[in-house]
């Protein structure tokens, strides 16, 4: 058994692991990374964020081709199969792996391929693919092993027509009708993708409103758009059982309803990847979803062991995971890079996309904050008209008296990009966070960014 000594060992090479390893390495620490894949990037690169967003981009291009009058004049709408569209995503994955492999090489981070588990509080044993065991001793260890789809024991995920958000990327045909169980972020994104390919989608939601954490107006806009695009949303429903057929599936609901489709995509929750870490050897406990509890420094109950990313739960975003990993390493190297990541923009890549930051109307009303609203509808924006993307709006919530921006919510074309302008102003200290910034700033024309000026004027006109 080979033995190696490090300052920091990072378990997992997804966004959290990458952020942690890079920060520690740049602070002069000797760093090792352990991942069970031969290629770095974690689930984000191989099964989650990157392939699904690349897939979405390709589907959106197909939708534009099939609905744009100029292209329709050339010929009839084209049909593309799911496997064909997926090929473009595979190219992006390869490029991402190459980039990230280069990061670790340039920063002299040693990458170990294998399954890592704790022998004790300062030792990780790595079982390599060839069966060889290597021992890594470290002063500090960061757990960033991510998560995987939650799989109820009573559902047969080995059935060829039953998928989760990982295995859906191996779908070898294009279903005519698809059931998506779970209307969270992942479920809504895949419902949009398959709808864009002309698939009839049944989206089953166990709550009364889509993405209820969003501003209610944005949630309602998404529901309306879904209803116009071959997506039937069934609220307040729970599954009783899943019946697999030779040519499809039947979803039995507790309400007594039955839904038949060519395939089922299960998108109801995630489970932390902690079951193979040997946490029982060091006294770290996990919750019912396999997640680790950490403090504001991302430290677990064992002082030299930290956690970051999906493995610690909320908010389970790639963007937040990277910052959490970087902050966990910052707690170790004490280079001023630590911060508790609690206010990050939400990006939801439905078609159209959604993004938000800060408070929504429900929260401000409940807190009895005197706020006002400013809106800019994309159908009136020159850039949106040029792009043929009239759906959507930008919504700014601000304090009636101080004009402090309290929340930014966007639905439509480039929403995940637009939100960062509002985020930047909201993070300014004191009176610099002010709605009038958007009135007094010159925006390029035509751009989607100038929606901020339109929304600011709209909001100021509501004051009296």
UniProtKB/Swiss-Prot annotation:
Alphabetical list of Gene3D superfamilies matching this protein: 3.30.390.30, FAD/NAD(P)-binding domain
Entry's Gene Ontology BP terms: 2-oxoglutarate metabolic process; NADP metabolic process
GO CC annotations on file: cytosol
Catalysed reaction, written as an equation: NAD(+) + NADPH = NADH + NADP(+)
Keyword Phosphoprotein among UniProt keywords: no
UniProt: FAD binding residues: 35-44
Cofactor(s) needed: FAD
GO function term, MF aspect, one: NAD(P)+ transhydrogenase (Si-specific) activity
Main localization category: cytoplasm
Highest taxon of the lineage: Bacteria
Record EC number: 1.6.1.1
Keywords carried by this UniProt record: Cytoplasm, FAD, Flavoprotein, NAD, NADP, Oxidoreductase
Xref: InterPro entries: Class-I_Pyr_Nuc-Dis_Oxidored, FAD/NAD-bd_sf, FAD/NAD-binding_dom, FAD/NAD-linked_Rdtase_dimer_sf, Pyr_nuc-diS_OxRdtase, Pyr_nucl-diS_OxRdtase_dimer, STH_gammaproteobact
Cofactor note: Binds 1 FAD per subunit.
Compartments (UniProt record): Cytoplasm
Function: Conversion of NADPH, generated by peripheral catabolic pathways, to NADH, which can enter the respiratory chain for energy generation.
Similarity field: Belongs to the class-I pyridine nucleotide-disulfide oxidoreductase family.
Protein name, UniProt field: Soluble pyridine nucleotide transhydrogenase
The organism of origin for this protein: Pseudomonas putida (strain ATCC 47054 / DSM 6125 / CFBP 8728 / NCIMB 11950 / KT2440)
């Amino acid at each position: 058994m080979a033995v190696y000594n490090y300052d920091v060992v990072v378990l997992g090479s997804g966004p959290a692991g990458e952020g942690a390893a890079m920060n520690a390495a740049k602070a002069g620490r000797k760093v090792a990374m352990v991942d069970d894949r031969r290629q770095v990037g974690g689930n984000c690169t191989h099964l989650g964020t990157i392939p699904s967003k690349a897939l979405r981009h390709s589907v959106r291009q197909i939708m534009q081709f099939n609905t744009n009058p100029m292209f329709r004049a050339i010929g009839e709408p084209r049909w593309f199969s799911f496997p064909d569209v997926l090929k473009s995503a595979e190219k992006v994955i390869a490029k991402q792996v190459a980039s990230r492999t280069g990061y670790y090489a340039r920063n002299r981070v040693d990458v170990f391929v294998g399954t890592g588990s704790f022998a004790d509080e300062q030792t990780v044993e790595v079982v390599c693919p060839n069966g060889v065991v290597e021992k890594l001793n470290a002063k500090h260890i960061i757990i960033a092993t991510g998560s995987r789809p939650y799989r109820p024991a009573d559902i047969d995920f080995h059935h060829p027509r039953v998928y989760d958000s990982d295995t859906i990327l191996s779908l070898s045909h294009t279903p005519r009708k698809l059931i998506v169980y779970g209307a969270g972020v992942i479920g809504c994104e895949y419902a949009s993708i398959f709808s864009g390919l002309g698939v009839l989608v049944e989206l089953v939601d166990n709550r009364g409103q889509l993405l209820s954490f969003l501003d209610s107006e944005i949630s309602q806009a998404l529901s309306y758009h879904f209803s116009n695009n071959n997506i039937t949303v069934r609220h307040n429903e729970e599954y009783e059982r899943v019946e697999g057929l030779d040519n499809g599936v039947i979803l039995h609901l507790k309400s007594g309803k039955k839904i038949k489709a060519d395939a089922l995509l299960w998108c109801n929750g995630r489970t932390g990847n902690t079951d193979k870490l040997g946490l029982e050897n060091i006294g770290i406990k996990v919750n019912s979803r396999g997640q680790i509890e950490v403090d504001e420094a991302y430290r677990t109950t064992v002082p030299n062991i930290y956690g970051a990313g999906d493995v610690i739960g909320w908010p389970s975003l790639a963007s937040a995971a990277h910052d959490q990993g970087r902050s966990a390493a910052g707690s170790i190297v004490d280079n001023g890079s630590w911060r508790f990541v609690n206010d990050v923009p939400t990006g939801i890549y439905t078609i159209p996309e959604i993004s938000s930051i800060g408070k929504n109307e429900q929260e401000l009303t409940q807190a009895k904050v005197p706020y006002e609203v400013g809106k800019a509808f994309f159908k009136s924006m020159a850039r949106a008209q040029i792009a043929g993307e009239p759906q959507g709006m930008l919504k700014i919530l601000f304090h009636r008296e101080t004009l402090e921006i309290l929340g930014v919510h966007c639905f439509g074309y480039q929403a995940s990009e637009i939100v960062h302008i509002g985020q930047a102003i909201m993070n300014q200290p004191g009176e610099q966070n002010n709605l009038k910034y958007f009135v007094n700033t010159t925006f390029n024309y035509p751009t989607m960014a100038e929606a901020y000026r339109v929304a600011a004027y709209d909001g100021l006109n509501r004051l009296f």
